[in-house]
Each structure stands twice: as C-alpha cells, then as structure tokens.
Amino acid sequence: MRVAEVVRNTSETQIRVKLNLDGTGQQKLATGVPFLDHMLDQIARHGLVDLEVEAHGDTHIDDHHTVEDVGITLGQAVAKAIGDRKGIRRYGHSYVPLDEALSRVVIDFSGRPGLEFHVPFTRARIGTFDVDLSIEFFRGFVNHAGVTLHIDNLRGINAHHQLETVFKAFGRALRAAVELDERAAGQIPSTKGSL
C-alpha cells in the first residue's frame, strides 16, 4: 500500500497529513479553515485518496500560513507515498464542470516543480476564504511533491463553483497520474530513466 504520514511543525503552524493513495476517498479533516476542509474533501473523494489532515495555525492573524502549509505537507506526503515513482502513469488530466463553471487540471510527476494557475476569480472571497490562498496552497503542493501543475478555469461566474471545479479536477488528475500501470511495472516513466 502506498501510504504516508508527514508532520510539519513551525512557529506558525502544526500540521499532520496522513494519506493512502490507493484508498476509497475517506477523509477526516480539521484544518481550522472550513472552506479548505471542503476543498480537501473534493481531493479525497474525486482522487479516491484516503486523507486525514489536522492543522493548528495562526488563524487569528489570517488563514495564509495554514492554507500554504497544508499544501506543503500534502505535497510531501504524496511524494513520500509514491516513492521512486516506478510504475506510475506520471501524467493525469481532468475537466470538471459545476453548473456554469468548467476547469481543467493537468499534472506531471516530472520531478520539476512548476505551477501555471489561471483562474479569473469573479470575487475576492468565498465567505471568509481569500481566493488568493488557493494559489499558495497549490504552490506549496507543487514545490514539495515535485510536480508540474497546470490549472485553468475555462469559464465561471460563481467563485465557489470556479474553485470547487479546480479542486475536483485536481483530485481526478492526481488519481490518474499516480495510478499504477501494470504494463510499466517497475519502470520509471521517462526516457531519462529517472524523475
């Protein structure tokens, strides 16, 4: 089983992430940021990743450090669970609609961190959640998972729908990329022989 647990403690946050890449989408989430919990639930359910996240952060200031550090810790946990990346499909993509919103996410477990994030949010906040923090979450993830990630919201009027389609598509793209390919068992999915 491809499981990992990572604990990250700083002066700003204390975070624990436990995941099973070959799960069924079960989750236990307590980040102290309700909208982030809602988005992590999308990753778990659509990625079929069993996911536990506990976070305590300086949310009395704002949610920035908690959201960013959860992204970092999730990236570390995914990288640890995948290990040497042998046998994975490496690439994944997904389009997800929600009413008027449509997003596309493409991921490459290349070993080269990179983020292209193009979401023209229609408002700055979803409830109390600052939509700019979604960029910080994904930046933290890509830098610590070692992936290239392209996120595009192709259309949308409702900011909640825009971001929810992004997280659902991310979960589905992640699931596709980390899936084991029986025909490539034990092989690194690269002509270089390493990722």
Curated annotation (Swiss-Prot):
Look up the signal peptide feature and give its range: none
What PROSITE patterns does the annotation carry? IGP_DEHYDRATASE_1, IGP_DEHYDRATASE_2
Q: State the compartments where it is located.
A: Cytoplasm
Quote the InterPro entries the UniProt record gives: IGPD_sf, ImidazoleglycerolP_deHydtase, ImidazoleglycerP_deHydtase_CS, Ribosomal_Su5_D2-typ_SF
User: Per the UniProt entry, what are the Gene Ontology biological process annotations, in alphabetical order?
Assistant: L-histidine biosynthetic process
Q: What is its EC number?
A: 4.2.1.19
Q: What is this protein called?
A: Imidazoleglycerol-phosphate dehydratase
